[in-house]
A protein has these predicted regions:
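Substrate-positioning beta->alpha
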Residues: 21, 72, 105, 122-142, ...
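Conserved Rossmann-fold NAD(P)-dependent oxidoreductase catalytic core, especially the SDR/UDP-sugar
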Residues: 8, 17-66
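NAD(P)-dependent short-chain dehydrogenase/reductase
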Residues: 83-89, 93-127
Length: 253
């Protein structure tokens, strides 16, 4: 997962070449079912429309390095279906939740807020979903998903200020000023410079700001209908995430 703007060799190697290696091995070994975890970012954005599943994937139709490589990889999966592989695709939205020690950007957002490291938040939001619901949906796709079909595993749109309000109701904290996206863009070079000096990834990028204002009206009706997918309210997700973080690290009470 990356919020970088440019496609790197590492992204191509992991997201595209790595996926094709797995597909080739699965086809050669005649595996019973192959489930590919794509992303809603791989789905071409159509402004003002509810976005549902598609079989049209192209890096030229999506924005950002991560989205482009996931679109390329998803296209590969559907090519292997035509070769005889029993494969299905799931498209999670913005994943958040406990038990993720991989450096998840949204978990880091929650952590930084609780530790009083966020000076402000940005106007905008996205569709955020619990990692446990994504896991359950992926397992259901393995059991019930139809060959060659795609399933969106989303929840609903939450404004960033709404997410932080939930965090505040669980863990306390102060209200943050909400910056317009244009102001966050002006500060972007400074944020990237500070992150580079500290040898840390930037808090946000041009691409992550784009996602906060993009169309995130994803429909999970198909997954609910065919897989029994039922995403939970984000309050439960954030409550459990903070409880997990407090067991893992000494967060402020």
């Amino acid at each position: 997962i990356s919020i970088a703007d440019k496609v790197t060799d590492d992204l191509l190697r992991v997201n595209v070449e790595g996926t094709e290696n797995l597909l080739s091995a699965a086809l050669g070994s005649r595996v019973k079912k192959f489930v590919y975890v794509s992303s809603v970012h791989a789905i071409p954005e159509q402004p003002l429309r509810v976005l549902s599943e598609t079989d049209d994937f192209s890096p030229d139709k999506v924005q950002g390095a991560y989205a482009k490589t996931k679109a390329m990889a998803t296209e590969k999966v559907l090519e292997y279906v035509k070769k005889g592989l029993n494969a299905v695709v799931v498209h999670p939205s913005g994943i958040l939740g406990p038990y993720d020690g991989s450096g998840n950007h949204l978990v880091q957002l929650v952590t930084d807020y609780v530790e009083n490291k966020l000076p402000a938040c940005v106007k905008g939001g996205y569709d955020f979903v619990d990692v446990r619901d994504v896991a359950a949906g992926t397992l259901a796709a393995a059991e019930k998903g139809r060959t060659g079909e795609c399933y969106i595993l989303s929840n609903r749109h939450y404004e960033i200020r709404e997410v932080l309000a939930i965090v505040r109701s669980v863990a306390g904290g102060r209200r943050l000023p909400v910056l317009p996206v244009w102001m966050a863009k002006l500060a972007l070079p400074l944020m990237e410079f500070i992150a580079k000096c500290k040898k840390k990834r930037p808090l946000y990028t041009k691409y992550s700001l784009y996602t906060l204002t993009s169309n995130d009206k994803f429909s999970h009706d198909k997954a609910s209908r065919e897989l029994g997918y039922r995403p939970r309210d984000l309050y439960e997700t954030i409550r459990d995430t903070i409880a997990w973080l407090r067991r893992k690290t000494p967060l402020p009470a």
